[in-house]
Amino acid sequence: MANFVGSWKLEQSENMDAVLQKLGINVIKRKLITSSKPEITFTLEGNKMTMKTVSALKTTVISFTFGEEFKEETADGRTVMTTFTKDSDSKISQVQKCPENTTHVVREVTGGKMIATVTVGDVKAVNNYHKV
């Protein structure tokens, strides 16, 4: 998991507005989210990872242990049940469940970049981050 530790700045986003629309996010929040370039910082202490996301909309901090479900309030205000899994040292998956839908986020680090693929139903977005 050391591959994730540090800060990552959003460089490019493809199709995120469509994903947010599928989640039922209103147009004003969607514009705020898609116009910002959030920075995500990962820290690791023992088997607990913390992910701090700073954006124009909100700053969120979540700490998690892989494989353990927990309640999360998302930056867009939804309450979801979230589980992270470690797929490899350079790939983690996140599943967010709520009554309306399920969101899958796969983050993969390769060559100094982090690619986050977000899928809700049949809609997919890809966010590219660079290490700062």
Curated annotation (Swiss-Prot):
Listed CDD domains: FABP
Keywords: Lipid-binding, Transport
Superkingdom per UniProt: Eukaryota
Recorded GO MF terms: lipid binding
Regions that span the bilayer: none
Pfam families for the chain: Lipocalin (PF00061)
PANTHER family noted in UniProt: FATTY ACID BINDING PROTEIN
Membership in a protein family: Belongs to the calycin superfamily. Fatty-acid binding protein (FABP) family.
Name of the molecule in the record: Fatty acid-binding protein type 3
Organism: Fasciola hepatica (Liver fluke)
